[in-house]
From Swiss-Prot:
Matching InterPro entries: DYW_dom, Pentatricopeptide_rpt, PPR_At4g14850-like_plant, TPR-like_helical_dom_sf
UniProt keyword annotations, A-Z: Mitochondrion, Repeat, Transit peptide
Pfam families recorded: DYW_deaminase (PF14432), PPR (PF01535)
Higher taxonomy: Eukaryota, Viridiplantae, Streptophyta, Embryophyta, Tracheophyta
The name this protein goes by in its record: Pentatricopeptide repeat-containing protein At1g29710, mitochondrial
């Protein structure tokens, strides 16, 4: 255990540790055990902990009403005929399939029937609900987990914060963090990562500063998260100072992961010469991840020569990282990335659809293309010109800038516009890093359509609103 975040509570005797062992023996016992333990805590002057436990007991007593209220907001649709066959195995099967919607419905049904879901299953469901479209379901799972664990269960609350981070709900995550009676270094990293992934880099640095001011000693994991934060904010100076302080002030020897993070921080901000010099001065042989990162970011910033040089090193260290397209293009890819996927037919705005402009199999191809042409015309009027330096190899062989538009995520944007409610936000998910040209284009599209556009790439969320991205053009 570490000192509590509020800076007031500490561990008195072994009784608080005893309280964390069993929810039934401490908080929910029908006998005199709780009163006995409370008497001991009062004897040693722990009035704050006594109040915390009393508050928790009141929460447990009102759990049924609270949870039913939350679940009631999430409409369940288990039909009577299906309900007869619903078991815990049904819940497990849905979780394995990744079907979080029906899993939450089954969870509600089972708990109404008196079945107490165990913590392991709830944490597994929490991982499935860590996505923007599952926010309401995530809140239901949150209530179920909190009702099951003690106030001092740090791991469960870390998982809840991680879940809300994936849901793009920083407010919910921060509320959980601030209400935690105690935490550990993993909690700090999870909360900082939540800030960073959702575009709040400055808040993450403020949290780290607050951590040190409380007299805590950061470890290597926390420093690595600090470097990731500085990558987002573009604060190379702060990141460099923290890298030096890591060894000089705290005696932490940098690992390969730390060198990789600092390389990415320098290269992301366009300091390619400094990044190359940093890599060449490493006291160990740079890993393939380091060279691959420098390769990708060199091409992002237009230094094709350095990118090609790094690509040669990547190929020597791990030839599987590259193929014919990635060795001549922007980022390393896998063969599975080019497998044609079935067009999405979901009605909600949270989806990512990929298909070529020549793909006539999509049922709405005509109206999508008409909308695409209209948006393209408005983009031209606003001065948008496709930046061909980001597209080489097969795309450049077309010798037509107009076709570049349809070879990226923009068709998915158009499909989302057509299928979502007016003025509602659009969320796009992808497993590759967004390129500068697409980033500029989506800022303009947020102005044209009047929509907030959230794009989750391989690392962070980009929120495009009124022509501005929350990442401040640093990612």
């Amino acid at each position: 255990m570490v000192r509590l975040w509020c800076g007031k509570l500490r561990l008195w005797k072994p009784y608080l540790a005893l309280a964390t062992q069993s929810r039934n023996s401490w908080f929910c016992s029908g006998g005199g055990a709780p009163s006995h333990h409370l008497h001991i805590l009062k004897k040693y002057g722990s009035s704050e902990i006594t109040e915390m436990i009393n508050r928790y007991k009141r929460n447990v007593a009102g759990h049924t009403l609270t949870q039913n209220s939350m679940v009631g907001q999430y409409k369940t649709t288990v039909s009577p005929s299906v309900a007869q066959n619903v078991t815990i195995e049904t819940f497990d099967s849905l979780c394995i399939q990744g079907n979080w919607r029906e899993a939450v419905e089954v969870l509600d049904y089972l708990e109404n029937k008196g079945y107490a879901m165990d913590l392991i299953r709830l944490l597994g469901l929490a991982k499935l609900c860590g996505k923007p479209e599952a926010l309401e379901a995530a809140r239901v799972v949150h209530e179920c987990i909190i009702a099951l664990v003690s106030p001092c269960d740090v791991g469960a609350r870390n998982a809840i914060i991680e879940m809300y981070s994936g849901c793009c709900s920083v407010d919910d995550a921060l509320k959980v963090f601030e209400e935690m009676p105690e935490w550990n270094s993993g909690t700090l990293c999870v909360m900082m990562r939540c800030f960073v992934n959702n575009g709040y880099g400055e808040e993450a640095i403020d949290l780290f500063t607050r951590f040190k001011e409380e007299g805590n000693k950061p470890n290597g994991e926390i420093f690595n998260q600090v470097f990731s934060t500085c990558t987002l904010t573009g604060d190379v100076k702060e990141g460099s100072l923290q890298f030096q302080a890591m060894y000089r002030e705290y005696g932490i020897v940098p690992s390969m992961e730390h060198y990789h993070s600092v390389t990415k921080m320098l290269a992301t901000s366009g300091h390619l010469d400094e990044a190359l010099n940093f890599v060449e001065r490493m006291p160990m042989e740079p890993s393939v991840d380091v060279w691959e990162t420098l390769m990708n970011l060199s091409r992002v910033h237009g230094d094709v020569e350095l990118g090609d040089r790094c690509a040669e090193l990547v190929e020597k260290l791990d030839a599987t990282r590259l193929d014919k397209v990635s060795s001549a293009g922007l980022v390393a890819t896998k063969a599975s990335d080019f497998v044609k996927k079935e067009p999405s037919t979901r009605s909600e705005p949270y989806f990512y659809s990929t298909f070529r402009p020549v793909d006539s199999s999509h049922p709405q191809m005509n109206i999508i293309y008409e909308t695409l042409m209209s948006l393209r015309s408005q983009l031209k009027e606003m001065g948008y010109v496709p930046d061909t330096r980001y597209y080489r190899s097969l795309i450049m062989a077309m010798e037509n800038k107009e076709q570049i538009f349809g070879y990226r995520e923009e068709i998915a944007v158009v499909e989302s516009l057509l299928k979502s409610k007016p003025r509602s936000a659009i969320t796009l998910l992808t497993n590759i890093r967004i390129v500068g040209d697409c980033h500029d284009m989506m800022k303009l599209m947020s102005v044209i359509t009047g929509r907030d556009m959230i794009k989750r790439d391989a690392k962070i969320y980009h929120l495009f609103k009124n022509g501005v991205c929350r990442c401040n053009n640093l990612w």
